[in-house]
C-alpha cells in the first residue's frame, strides 16, 4: 500500500489540474496518507538526468507548451537547484542568453520543439521525446518523503502560473 500520494503541482489545463489535485487530496484524506506536491518541470527533468550523459556544468531547461511562441520554463542545474524560477516566456533568439553564454543548456519537453528554430546559440542542445511520466515522479517523491515535505491536504492548491480568464464564445448557439 502507498505511504503517500504524490501529484504534479504545476502547469496544465486549469480543469485538469483541479480534477487531478482534488482526486489526490481525496485519496490522501480517505486513506489517511500524506500528500506530496511535485513541480512538473522537475519531474520532466528526471529522465534527462537518468538517461542522458550531460557535462558537469550543464543546465536544464524543461519547457511546457503554453501556446503560440510562449512556454512555461525554468532553469536548473544538474542537482535540480533552481537557477531561474518558472516563468511564462515568449521565446525569441535572445531567450536564455544569460545561461547560454555561460554553459551548455539542454532544452526538452513539449515546448522545446517550437523553440529550436529561435534558439540557435552553440550552447543550445535539444533533447526530443521527453514527456512527464508518472514513473519519473518516484525519485523526487522518495526525496520528499525522506524530508517529510508533505502538503496540507485541506489547503493544497495547484500552482497556476497565469490567472484563469473566462471568455464568452465568439458565436452563440442561437446564431
Task: Show the residue positions of the predicted features.
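A residue-level signal for conserved active-site and pocket-lining positions in enzyme catalytic cores
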Residues: 12, 27, 107, 138, ...
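Active-site catalytic microenvironments for nucleophilic, acid-base chemistry
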Residues: 30, 47-51, 78, 140-147
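Surface "functional belts" at beta-alpha junctions
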Residues: 34-132, 160, 165-166
Amino acid at each position: 500500500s502507498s505511504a503517500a500520494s504524490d501529484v504534479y503541482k504545476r502547469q496544465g489545463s486549469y480543469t485538469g489540474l483541479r480534477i487531478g489535485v482534488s482526486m489526490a487530496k481525496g485519496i490522501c484524506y480517505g486513506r489517511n496518507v500524506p500528500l506530496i506536491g511535485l513541480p512538473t518541470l522537475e519531474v520532466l527533468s528526471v529522465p534527462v538526468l537518468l538517461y542522458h550523459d550531460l557535462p558537469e556544468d550543464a543546465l536544464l531547461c524543461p519547457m511546457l507548451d503554453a501556446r503560440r511562441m510562449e512556454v512555461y520554463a525554468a532553469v536548473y542545474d544538474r542537482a535540480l537547484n533552481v537557477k531561474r524560477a518558472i516563468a511564462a516566456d515568449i521565446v525569441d533568439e535572445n531567450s536564455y542568453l544569460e545561461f547560454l553564454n555561460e554553459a551548455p543548456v539542454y532544452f526538452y519537453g513539449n515546448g522545446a520543439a517550437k523553440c529550436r528554430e529561435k534558439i540557435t546559440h552553440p550552447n543550445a542542445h535539444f533533447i526530443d521525446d521527453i514527456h512527464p511520466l508518472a514513473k519519473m515522479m518516484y525519485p523526487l517523491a522518495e526525496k520528499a518523503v525522506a524530508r517529510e515535505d508533505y502538503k496540507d491536504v485541506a489547503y493544497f492548491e495547484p500552482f497556476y502560473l497565469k490567472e484563469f480568464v473566462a471568455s464568452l464564445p465568439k458565436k452563440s448557439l442561437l446564431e
